[in-house]
């Protein structure tokens, strides 16, 4: 938006430039279609406006400093992004402005904070709560509407036309399913495939091939070779770095402090295990004996000589 001051011609060149120009159409307001005699003229996209005519088309609020122009209409910032933003809220289907607080999923779904509700019961979904994501219908729902597990001995067959009703805390009645709606087991597998984590969202329980609910940890962190070289070099000098030292390495490697902390804990545990293993083998070697087969705690056996020899060497370190 350009603000021009209308004043008498003061130079010959301006007189020459004005020859052949239709001043009536040039100084006519594009909004009210009236002639502009004001001292100041607002110019947008080669159109002139009265100062009082520059206001939002939707809310009619005056726009003195900044406005948005689209298809011949003037908008304030709020209504421009609401109607013409390239990013749309999956909940209310309205535009998202740069100042709005939103939840964004890796599938590309964006929700206003106030629109982040269960599509079935309308309950607001809080951060940290388990949710179901349907990126085809672009909806989210709470775990109350999670389909029941299917066992080999019981459960509705695939292609069933109904699903059981929700829990007593929900006011939603049983609703029919389309013929193409997947079975409960298929839904669980899709949740596993489309359970996206974003910010406070967490999906910890998923169904495996045997339809058992397993506790799944967070995504594994892949450490690149150059990052691993930095951590190994630091470990050789300081096996148990301070919090300040870990923070410096986090900035240097791009890894989070939590990842670095866990890496050092695992590395120290591995070093202790190797140390105890060497002592265990040396204990029998000094006596000219052949050590018995080594079994670790995750193997099924009644007694474990090596673990008894090592003691509790896997207890966690106290971090700063």
From Swiss-Prot:
Q: Where found, per UniProt?
A: Nucleus
Q: Which domain of life is it from?
A: Eukaryota
Q: Which PROSITE patterns match?
A: HOMEOBOX_2 (PS50071), LIM_DOMAIN_1 (PS00478), LIM_DOMAIN_2 (PS50023)
The GO terms describing molecular function are: DNA-binding transcription factor activity, RNA polymerase II-specific; metal ion binding; RNA polymerase II transcription regulatory region sequence-specific DNA binding
The UniProt keyword set, sorted, is: Developmental protein, DNA-binding, Homeobox, LIM domain, Metal-binding, Nucleus, Repeat, Zinc
| Broad class of where this protein is predominantly found | nucleus
Q: Which GO terms describe its cellular component?
A: nucleus
**Entry's Gene Ontology BP terms:** neuron differentiation
Q: Which Gene3D superfamilies is this protein grouped with?
A: Cysteine Rich Protein, Homeodomain-like
Query: Mind telling me which InterPro entries this protein's record contains?
Result: HD, Homeodomain-like_sf, LIM_Homeobox_TF, Znf_LIM
Give the DNA-binding residue ranges.
216-275
Q: Which PANTHER family match?
A: LIM/HOMEOBOX PROTEIN LHX, MECHANOSENSORY PROTEIN 3
What's the name of the protein? Mechanosensory protein 3
| Organism encoding this protein | Caenorhabditis remanei
């Amino acid at each position: 938006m350009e603000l021009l001051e209308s004043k008498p011609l003061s130079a010959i060149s301006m007189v020459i430039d004005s020859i052949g120009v239709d001043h009536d159409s040039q100084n006519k307001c594009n909004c009210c279609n009236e002639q502009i005699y004001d001292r100041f003229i607002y110019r947008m996209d080669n159109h002139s406006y009265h100062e009082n005519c520059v206001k939002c088309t939707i809310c009619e609020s005056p726009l003195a400093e900044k406005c948005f122009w689209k298809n011949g209409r003037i908008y304030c910032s709020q209504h421009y992004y609401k109607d013409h933003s390239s990013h749309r809220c999956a909940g209310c289907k309205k535009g998202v402005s740069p100042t709005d607080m939103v939840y964004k999923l890796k599938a590309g779904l964006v929700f206003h904070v106030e629109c982040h509700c269960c599509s079935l019961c309308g309950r607001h979904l809080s951060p940290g709560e388990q949710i179901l994501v349907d990126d085809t219908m672009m909806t989210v729902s709470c775990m109350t509407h999670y389909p029941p597990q299917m066992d080999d001995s019981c459960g509705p067959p695939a292609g069933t036309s109904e699903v059981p009703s929700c829990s007593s805390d929900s006011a939603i009645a049983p609703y029919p399913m389309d013929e193409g709606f997947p079975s409960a087991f298929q839904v669980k597998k899709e949740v596993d495939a489309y359970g996206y984590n974003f910010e406070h969202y967490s999906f910890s329980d998923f169904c495996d091939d045997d339809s058992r609910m397993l506790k799944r940890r967070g995504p594994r962190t892949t450490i690149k070779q150059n990052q691993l070289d930095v951590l190994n070099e630091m470990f050789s000098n300081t096996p148990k770095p301070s919090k300040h030292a870990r923070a410096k390495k986090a900035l240097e490697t791009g890894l989070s402090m939590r990842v670095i902390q866990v890496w050092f804990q695992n590395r120290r545990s591995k070093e202790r295990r190797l140390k105890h293993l060497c002592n265990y083998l040396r204990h029998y070697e000094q006596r000219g004996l052949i050590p018995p087969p080594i079994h670790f705690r995750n193997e099924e056996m009644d007694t474990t000589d090596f673990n008894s020899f090592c003691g509790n060497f896997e207890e966690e370190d106290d971090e700063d």
